[in-house]
């Protein structure tokens, strides 16, 4: 068998998450990113044994610029030809960015040291049609200096090792995670939206819906519906009810996964 480590970017708008399911080959209206890559890989290998295993199981509608996956195929092929072959068969909203040889022992889904996500949102009375499927619309006039200071104060509460039971889907197993970095930035790189901001969060791992619940709490905070003490309480004690709705998937982007090569 031959093994490769690939870096993948995708726009998750039209996909039902990363993880392949049997429906990928049965119902094209419900594709997943992994399943779409696997179908392309089968064509390259003439339907010989092949597998794709990702490092992060992103939800439906979530995007990625730095997903990592391991590809296993029986056919001998160079990394360069595999990259070109996959990109020629994949839809334009999925791209293989890098492809390097790997080993049988390497497991993409294990051993990551950290993961970095960004959550993009636009604060304006009217949504921006150019970014409506990659950023959340927050229907307020603007985010001023005081709002930004408040959001950053809230972000600091999440840094460190905490029990994120209240900020995740119930039944996720152990709910302790360590956050290395959490802050709000203005997305100055975007000429399409001067009012775009993003949450940058880096941690040793994230529970299901964890970042979306954190972002949901930040949105409620800037709207004045909760206060900082509410966030502190929900980090300290298990609660019956959620502090906020979870933010929509479309603003979430997987940026980077650090781990063994």
Swiss-Prot record:
Its EC number is 5.4.99.12. GO terms for biological process: tRNA pseudouridine synthesis. The keyword 4Fe-4S does not apply. Substrate binds at residue 117. Keywords: Isomerase, tRNA processing. One of its GO terms (molecular function) is RNA binding. It is an enzyme of class 5 (isomerase). The active site is at 59 (nucleophile). It holds the Pfam family PseudoU_synth_1. Transmembrane segments: none annotated. Homodimer. NCBIfam families: hisT_truA. Formation of pseudouridine at positions 38, 39 and 40 in the anticodon stem and loop of transfer RNAs. Belongs to the tRNA pseudouridine synthase TruA family. This is tRNA pseudouridine synthase A 2. It comes from Desulfotalea psychrophila (strain LSv54 / DSM 12343).
């Amino acid at each position: 068998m031959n093994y490769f480590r690939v870096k993948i970017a995708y726009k998750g708008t039209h996909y039902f998450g990363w993880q392949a399911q049997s429906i990928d080959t049965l119902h094209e209206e419900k594709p997943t990113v992994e399943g779409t890559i696997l179908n392309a890989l089968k064509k390259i290998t003439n339907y010989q044994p092949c597998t794709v295993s990702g490092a992060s199981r992103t939800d439906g509608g979530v995007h990625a610029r730095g997903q990592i996956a391991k590809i296993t195929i029986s056919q001998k092929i160079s990394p360069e030809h595999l990259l070109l072959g996959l990109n020629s068969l994949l839809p334009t909203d999925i791209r293989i960015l890098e492809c390097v040889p790997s080993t049988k022992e390497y497991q993409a889904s294990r051993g990551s040291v950290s993961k970095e996500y960004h959550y993009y949102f636009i604060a304006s009375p009217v949504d921006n049609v150019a970014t409506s499927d990659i950023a959340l619309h927050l229907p307020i006039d603007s985010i001023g200096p005081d709002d930004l200071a408040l959001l950053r104060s809230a972000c600091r509460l999440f840094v460190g090792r905490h029990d994120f039971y209240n900020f995740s889907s119930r039944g996720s197993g152990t709910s302790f995670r360590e956050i290395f970095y959490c802050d709000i930035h203005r997305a100055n790189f975007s000429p399409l939206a001067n009012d775009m901001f993003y949450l940058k969060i880096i941690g040793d791992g994230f529970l299901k819906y964890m970042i979306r619940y954190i972002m949901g709490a930040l949105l409620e905070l800037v709207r004045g519906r909760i206060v900082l003490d509410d966030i502190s309480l929900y980090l300290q004690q298990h609660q019956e009810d959620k502090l906020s709705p979870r933010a929509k998937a479309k603003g979430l982007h997987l940026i980077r996964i650090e781990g063994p090569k």
